[in-house]
């Protein structure tokens, strides 16, 4: 697998565009992804019981058509908790896009992100849609879907399948309200491989638990968020089927893209200054390892200690203890980077200057060794700073 300098339109047969329509005061806030042909599609969606209108419409269309040819996204207005009018507006957003592209409405996905409770300004939507073009500036799409994010989040890779080169690209937004189960964010992945929607869904579902479901910024789960994967077959490779080496290679490719996007989201948490990576090793099973890793990275006390560059391993141990995992606690090792701070559940003296260098880094790695099996789990998050409160206190102003 090779990482390339690309964007969401790097796979064959895809294009994208993004622009400022007026959902936000100044920044780009509206965009689309378009495939030359209907693409196989797979999706996972928010587990919040309150579900935004665009997500309902998109999920319904994916189930009905089993294909998707276009995806249109706005940022600044979530169209969530907007009642029957919100549903009507989401269907209209879908219909208007389909009409412009001259395709069936059920082949259009819609997504929105932003302030909950505000109705969609349909005149703004119509104006923005009139300006979007096929084969526009694909890099602008990554900008158009952002809200409180400080940077775009993209990744693109290629992989050989026999004589054919398959390209896969991903883009995501997410900075706050990140505690997925799915994943609290929007993420879109495009690919040019020949693969059915059913097989694509299998690959996505297998990989979401160890990627997007293992990030947390603030413990909040949004109402709008989803991951969609589109693969249009333009490479004309031999079809990728389940339980084959080609499927395993494709799944590994997808896992890499999803994990990279997940890490970029965690690193760009609102007000964040550091990425936190927690790895639990030698656990009884992978589920327990992932639960424990996410417990540690989600601890507010661990997050604030990391922000303060304080190697407070007691907070890490406490988060291990309340993770809900039944493991012996009398033989646990904890490391910050490669420095042991606890061995066999007993504190260890460490060099303060070496530890200061570790804690000043942009990425803090915490390793928890349970000595209770051979499974591994990882989770990602960020520190909790003064700016997180400031950003969210002033979000609507």
Curated annotation (Swiss-Prot):
InterPro entries, per database record: Arg_biosynth_ArgJ, ArgJ-like_dom_sf, ArgJ_beta_C
EC number: 2.3.1.35, 2.3.1.1
Role according to the record: Catalyzes two activities which are involved in the cyclic version of arginine biosynthesis: the synthesis of N-acetylglutamate from glutamate and acetyl-CoA as the acetyl donor, and of ornithine by transacetylation between N(2)-acetylornithine and glutamate.
Pathway assigned in UniProt: Amino-acid biosynthesis; L-arginine biosynthesis; L-ornithine and N-acetyl-L-glutamate from L-glutamate and N(2)-acetyl-L-ornithine (cyclic): step 1/1; Amino-acid biosynthesis; L-arginine biosynthesis; N(2)-acetyl-L-ornithine from L-glutamate: step 1/4
Site, Involved in the stabilization of negative charge on the oxyanion by the formation of the oxyanion hole: residue positions: 113-114
Keywords associated with the record: Acyltransferase, Amino-acid biosynthesis, Arginine biosynthesis, Autocatalytic cleavage, Cytoplasm, Multifunctional enzyme, Transferase
Protein name in UniProt: Arginine biosynthesis bifunctional protein ArgJ
Annotated catalysed reactions: N(2)-acetyl-L-ornithine + L-glutamate = N-acetyl-L-glutamate + L-ornithine; L-glutamate + acetyl-CoA = N-acetyl-L-glutamate + CoA + H(+)
Database matches in Pfam families: ArgJ
Source organism per UniProt: Streptococcus mutans serotype c (strain ATCC 700610 / UA159)
Assembly mode: Heterotetramer of two alpha and two beta chains.
GO (cellular component) term, any one: cytoplasm
Cell location: Cytoplasm
GO molecular function: glutamate N-acetyltransferase activity; L-glutamate N-acetyltransferase activity
Gene name, Swiss-Prot/TrEMBL: argJ
């Amino acid at each position: 697998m090779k990482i390339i300098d690309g964007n969401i339109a790097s796979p064959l047969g895809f294009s994208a565009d993004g622009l400022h329509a007026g959902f936000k005061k100044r920044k780009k806030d509206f965009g689309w992804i378009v495939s030359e042909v209907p693409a196989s599609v797979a999706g996972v969606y928010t587990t919040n019981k309150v579900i935004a209108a665009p997500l309902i419409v998109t999920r319904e269309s994916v189930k009905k058509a089993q294909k998707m040819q276009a995806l249109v996204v706005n940022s600044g207005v979530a169209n969530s908790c907007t009642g029957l009018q919100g549903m009507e507006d989401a269907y209209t957003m879908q219909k208007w896009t389909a009409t412009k592209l001259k395709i069936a409405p059920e082949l259009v996905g819609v997504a929105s992100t932003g302030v909950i409770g505000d109705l969609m300004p349909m005149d703004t939507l119509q104006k923005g849609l009139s300006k979007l073009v096929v084969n526009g500036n694909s890099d602008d799409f990554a900008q158009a879907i952002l809200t409180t994010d400080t940077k775009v989040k993209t990744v693109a890779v290629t992989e050989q399948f026999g004589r054919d080169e398959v390209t896969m690209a991903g883009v995501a937004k997410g900075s706050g309200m990140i505690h997925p189960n799915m994943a609290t964010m929007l993420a879109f992945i495009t690919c040019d491989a020949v693969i059915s929607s059913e097989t694509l869904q299998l690959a996505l579902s297998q990989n979401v638990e160890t990627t997007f479901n293992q990030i947390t910024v603030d413990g909040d789960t949004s109402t709008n968020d989803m991951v969609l994967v589109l693969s249009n077959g333009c490479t004309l490779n031999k079809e990728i089927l389940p339980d084959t080496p080609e499927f395993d290679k494709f799944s590994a490719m997808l896992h890499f893209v999803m994990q990279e996007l997940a890490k970029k989201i965690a690193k760009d948490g609102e007000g964040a200054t550091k990425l936190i990576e927690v790895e639990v090793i030698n656990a009884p099973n992978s589920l327990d390892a992932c639960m424990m890793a996410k417990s540690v990275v989600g601890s507010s006390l661990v997050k604030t200690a990391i922000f303060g560059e304080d190697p407070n391993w007691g907070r890490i141990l406490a988060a291990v203890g309340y993770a809900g995992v039944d493991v012996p606690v009398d033989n646990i090792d904890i490391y910050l980077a490669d420095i042991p701070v606890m061995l066999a559940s007993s504190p260890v003296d460490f060099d303060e200057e070496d530890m200061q260098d570790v804690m000043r880094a942009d990425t803090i790695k915490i390793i928890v060794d349970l000595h209770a099996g051979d499974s591994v789990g990882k989770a990602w998050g960020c520190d909790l700073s003064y700016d997180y409160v400031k950003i969210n206190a002033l979000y609507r102003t």
